[in-house]
């Protein structure tokens, strides 16, 4: 009751204080109005007094004098009213201060008497404890004709919960998570997470979070119970810590190991250059070895005129097969090559063809030289009539693409380009090409030291083992020179152009180099007195210094 009276006294003080404040504001407005009137009357009285000084005696003078006296009287009344209002305002302000002081006293008393929320909750709990609740058993006991064996479902559920409480709350698994919390930002970082056996887990520490599924206990870094002021964790924080711990467990360091294959035949062996002594058994044995290694790519070898023992292996990932596979011939130092040479019409080389010719001047075949003197039209091998077969033979036995098997790729080789010559139809050419039957036979001569001809030399791979299947490594393919439509020979297959159709044959090159009437191609001056070409002389001098002999 005392608290209620104090609350009422405080409310009354607040109301009186509010009324006094409104009254003070009204009186101040009235004072402002009185001051305005007082100033107006003062100005009017001064003006009338100034006018009376200039007017003589008479009726008008008397009236103005009387009006001036009335104005002065009103001015005095206004001054008194203003003073009275100011005094009343001062009294009201004093009363307001007194009411405020009384309000503060009442507020202090209320704070000393008023109960906190905890006290109110505690008192409510005590009141509930004082009032005994009727149990369910007592309620059902008052029901007549109820069998004694009947147990209400609610009571049965409560009994089951009490009996199975320990079993339901037994930990299925436990995990120790080390967490570092930044006191500035409040962020928690999981340092490590270690799973623990649920049997060895003991509820040590302060419980900071619990629901029907999981419980979280806070333990200090020295495995002791954390201090009692540990704050609880929100469900969001618990979920975040569990997510970080699971992510940390899922991360495993990268392990590097050797490649593992399902069977030992899934990776091809590095292809080696073969050193064929007898033609028959070696080729068959090598083919069986490739199949045993489990190669998925079809290997095709075209052996044509194998007097040199050279074989080109072509393979790709598209199951390419060779049209023919002739029987290899015994090995020797000379490889006979067939080329079909077609007579071209008269034309000048275009600028791009000239640049391509200059580029081809520096194409090198390691440790190989051409000897025009050994070309004989009588040594012709088997010929193929189809254009596709001719192109394959042209590419297969081209001197730029052929590579002897016993050449060491690491040693440098010097070659001198002899030049190109356009084939023109004239009388001189007809004289030079007497007995020409459409086929020129060239010989590939390998200049090598006899002492280095060691058959037991270590074998080296002919090309990269995975180059045909690689998408990164693709060897450059020779591009054919551009030709006009009118300059294409009708005997050539235009769908399969070979980049070496325009190259001059060795026999024709020899005859033109030895001819005094022909001019040297590419601007090299030839001797006009019948002597041999200076480039050929330079070649002979170079070979003589090396201890070789040009045949």
UniProtKB/Swiss-Prot annotation:
Question: What residues does the Glycyl lysine isopeptide (Lys-Gly) (interchain with G-Cter in SUMO2) crosslink join?
Answer: 125, 178
In this chain, where does the modification Phosphothreonine occur? 270
Return the InterPro entries for the record: Paralemmin
Composition bias of kind Basic and acidic residues appears in 247-258, 484-495
Enumerate the Gene Ontology biological process terms. Answer: regulation of cell shape
Q: Which residues carry this modification: Phosphoserine?
A: 135, 163, 322, 350, 371, 376, 385-386, 498, 515, 520
Q: Where is this region: Disordered?
A: 247-267, 298-387, 452-536
Q: Look up the record and report any one GO term of the cellular component aspect.
A: dendrite
A Pfam cross-reference name: Paralemmin
Q: Which residues form a coiled coil?
A: 12-106
Q: How is expression of this protein distributed across tissues? A: Expressed in the brain and the spinal cord. Expressed in the anterior olfactory nucleus, the olfactory tubercle, the nucleus supraopticus, the nucleus of the lateral olfactory tract, the piriform cortex, the cortico-amygdaloid transition zone, the septofimbrial nucleus and the indusium griseum (at protein level).
Q: Which UniProt keywords apply?
A: Acetylation, Cell projection, Coiled coil, Cytoplasm, Isopeptide bond, Phosphoprotein, Synapse, Ubl conjugation
Residues joined by cross-link Glycyl lysine isopeptide (Lys-Gly) (interchain with G-Cter in SUMO1): 178
Self-association state and partner proteins as the record states:
Interacts with GLUL.
Family statement drawn from the similarity comment of this UniProt entry = Belongs to the paralemmin family.
Would you tell me the protein name for this molecule? Palmdelphin
The protein's organism comes out as: Rattus norvegicus (Rat)
* Lineage per the UniProt record: Eukaryota, Metazoa, Chordata, Craniata, Vertebrata
């Amino acid at each position: 009751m005392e608290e209620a009276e104090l609350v009422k006294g405080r409310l009354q003080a607040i109301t009186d204080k509010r009324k006094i404040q409104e009254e003070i504001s009204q009186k101040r407005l009235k004072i402002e109005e009185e001051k305005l009137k007082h100033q107006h009357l003062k100005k009017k009285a001064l003006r009338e007094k100034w006018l009376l000084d200039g007017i003589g005696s008479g009726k008008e003078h008397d009236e103005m004098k009387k009006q001036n006296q009335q104005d002065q009287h009103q001015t005095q009344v206004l001054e008194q009213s203003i003073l009275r209002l100011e005094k009343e305002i001062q009294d009201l302000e004093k009363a307001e201060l007194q009411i405020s002081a009384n309000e503060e006293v009442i507020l202090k008393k209320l704070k000393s008497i008023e109960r906190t929320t905890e006290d109110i909750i505690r008192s409510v709990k005590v009141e509930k404890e004082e009032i005994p609740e009727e149990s369910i058993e007592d309620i059902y006991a008052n029901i007549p004709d109820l069998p004694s064996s009947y147990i209400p479902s609610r009571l049965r559920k409560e009994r089951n919960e009490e009996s199975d409480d320990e079993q339901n709350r037994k930990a299925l698994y436990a995990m120790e998570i080390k967490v570092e919390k930044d006191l500035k930002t409040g962020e928690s970082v999981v340092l490590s997470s270690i799973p623990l056996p649920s049997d060895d887990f003991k509820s040590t520490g302060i419980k900071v979070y619990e629901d029907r599924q999981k419980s979280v206990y806070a333990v200090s870094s020295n495995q002791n119970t954390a201090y009692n002021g540990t704050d609880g964790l929100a469900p969001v924080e618990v979920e975040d810590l569990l997510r970080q711990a699971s992510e940390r467990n899922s991360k495993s360091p990268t392990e590097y190991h050797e490649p593992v294959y399902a069977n030992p035949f899934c990776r091809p062996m590095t292809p080696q250059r073969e050193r064929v002594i007898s033609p028959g058994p070696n080729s068959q044995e090598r083919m069986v070895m490739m199949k045993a290694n489990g190669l998925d790519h079809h290997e095709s070898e075209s052996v044509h005129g194998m007097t040199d023992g050279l074989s080109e292996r072509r393979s790709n990932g598209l199951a390419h097969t060779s049209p023919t596979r002739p029987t290899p011939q015994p090995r020797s130092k000379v490889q006979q090559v067939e080329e079909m040479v077609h007579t071209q019409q008269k034309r000048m080389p275009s600028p791009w063809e000239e640049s391509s010719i200059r580029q081809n001047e520096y194409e090198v075949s390691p440790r190989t030289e051409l000897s025009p003197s050994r070309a004989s039209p009588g040594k012709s091998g088997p010929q193929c009539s189809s254009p596709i077969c001719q192109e394959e033979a042209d590419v297969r036995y081209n001197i730029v693409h052929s590579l002897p098997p016993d050449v060491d790729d690491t040693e440098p080789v010097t070659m001198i380009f002899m030049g190109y010559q356009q084939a023109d139809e004239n009388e001189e050419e007809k004289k030079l090409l007497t007995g020409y039957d459409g086929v020129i036979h060239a010989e590939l001569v390998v200049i090598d030291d006899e002492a280095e001809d060691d058959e037991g030399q270590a074998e080296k791979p002919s090309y990269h083992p995975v180059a045909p299947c690689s998408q990164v490594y693709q060897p450059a393919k020779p591009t054919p020179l551009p030709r006009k439509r009118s300059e294409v020979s009708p005997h050539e297959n235009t769908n399969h152009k070979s980049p070496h159709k325009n190259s001059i044959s060795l026999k024709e090159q020899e005859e033109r180099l030895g001819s005094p009437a022909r001019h040297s191609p590419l601007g090299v001056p030839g001797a006009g007195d019948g002597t041999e070409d200076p480039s050929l002389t330079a070649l002979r001098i170079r070979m003589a210094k090396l201890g070789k002999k040009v045949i």
